[in-house]
């Protein structure tokens, strides 16, 4: 039975996935260190494949880096070599590719306790369970009714699972909002508890990740203004109470930054915990797909 299951998964990936070439180039940066983190590397990813871009989420599972794009694709890299990735088209319940912007605008992803990929979408706010081959493998996740009131382009920007499998979801909201809304799934998998985080200095949430082995989360927030450019903030977030903790870092010029939206935590073999961030280039020639790695101190 196990042999046939492995064979099926291999064959399905071969059918649905297509490898593309990706170029990786180191980006120079000045040393950056705080009490909590140290900047270790920044690389830029490019590809001639027109599907590559708009990477707005990030997850690391074993030795695989997984991301989703704004145009409805799943990208799967090897953590050892990001020079090639498999591209998978996300599909709807009928097995058709997601083509309309309202349907394909994915923002975040996480893994549930059964191994399914949970992918959040905005505009048509929803969270759908997917296989690694881009196929829906279950019913949509029941969400709090208040999610429907989130703006089209300010929906489920960040999601993550706690150690017991419950979801934490964060709404980006409107620019003028004074608070950030988040919801923690109940143990019954039906109810939700709403929490709020005070918005500080007009930063908006873009990503969320859980540190290995505990329910301590790291919240990624971004601020942009034409004159000052992009700034990032990383904060601890209690996954049980929803309260903001210490600020790990504030990054701005001269550090090379872009539209960072995805974040994932992972642990090296030596026990060191790393944070990896990825930026969404919006398929614009004025932006870049950057991957930044920081070490927790």
Task: Give the label of every model feature segment.
Residues 4-12:
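Sec-dependent N-terminal signal peptides
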Residues 14-297:
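Sequence/structural signature of beta-propeller domains
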């Amino acid at each position: 039975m196990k042999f046939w299951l492995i064979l099926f998964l291999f064959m399905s990936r071969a059918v649905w996935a297509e490898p593309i070439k990706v170029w990786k180039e180191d980006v120079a940066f000045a040393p950056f260190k705080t009490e909590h983190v140290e900047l270790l590397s920044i690389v830029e990813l490019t590809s001639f494949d027109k599907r590559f871009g708009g990477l707005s989420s990030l997850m690391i599972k074993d030795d695989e880096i997984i991301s989703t794009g704004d145009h409805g694709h799943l990208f799967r890299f090897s953590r050892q070599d990001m020079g090639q990735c498999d591209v998978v088209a996300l599909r709807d319940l009928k097995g058709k590719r997601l083509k309309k912007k309202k349907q394909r605008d994915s923002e975040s992803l996480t893994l549930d306790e059964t191994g399914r990929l949970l992918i959040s979408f905005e505009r048509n706010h929803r969270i759908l369970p997917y296989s690694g081959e881009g196929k829906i493998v279950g019913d949509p996740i029941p969400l709090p009714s208040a999610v429907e009131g989130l703006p089209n382009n300010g929906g489920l920007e960040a999601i993550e699972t706690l150690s017991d499998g419950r979801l934490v979801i964060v709404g980006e909201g409107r620019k003028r909002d004074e608070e950030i809304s988040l919801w923690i799934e109940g143990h019954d998998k039906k109810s939700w508890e709403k929490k709020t985080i005070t918005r500080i200095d007009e930063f908006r949430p873009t990503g969320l990740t859980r540190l290995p082995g505990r329910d301590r989360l790291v919240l990624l927030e971004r601020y942009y203004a034409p004159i000052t450019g992009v700034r990032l903030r990383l904060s601890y977030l209690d996954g049980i109470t929803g309260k903001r903790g210490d600020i790990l870092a504030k990054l701005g010029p001269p550090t090379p930054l872009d539209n960072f939206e995805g974040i994932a935590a992972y642990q090296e073999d030596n026990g060191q915990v790393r944070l990896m961030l990825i930026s969404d280039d919006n398929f614009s020639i004025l932006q870049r797909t950057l991957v930044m790695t920081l070490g927790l101190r």
